[in-house]
From Swiss-Prot:
GO MF, one example: structural constituent of ribosome
InterPro entries in alphabetical order: Ribosomal_uL18_bac-type, Ribosomal_uL18_bac/euk
Highest taxon of the lineage: Bacteria
Protein name stated in the entry: Large ribosomal subunit protein uL18
Gene Ontology annotations for the cellular component aspect, listed alphabetically: cytosolic large ribosomal subunit
Oligomeric form and interacting partners: Part of the 50S ribosomal subunit; part of the 5S rRNA/L5/L18/L25 subcomplex. Contacts the 5S and 23S rRNAs.
Amino acid sequence: MISKIDKNKVRLKRHARVRTNLSGTAEKPRLNVYRSNKHIYAQIIDDNKGVTLAQASSKDSDIATTATKVELATKVGEAIAKKATDKGIKEIVFDRGGYLYHGRVKALAEAARESGLEF
């Protein structure tokens, strides 16, 4: 059985491999997802300038509730999409951070899509 430490090493290797071909621009920034055991974080990043354009997390006061982790991820996806559309961002590149497209990562992505982001 693969241990948690080994699982994270594999994820980091996968993320580094994907990031070589994945980059955000001012016209089409990158939506980065980080998932911890308790929270989920999303950032929209312009890699050319090295600037975070918008961010949302399950720790934000308007999102943090006593809900399941998947429900919180859905709220984070809706919040990041709203912040992006307020700044005029419609298209993004989705960076799942080496995580499988399943569960919380999938819930965040689908909520962002339904809220108006295109990827």
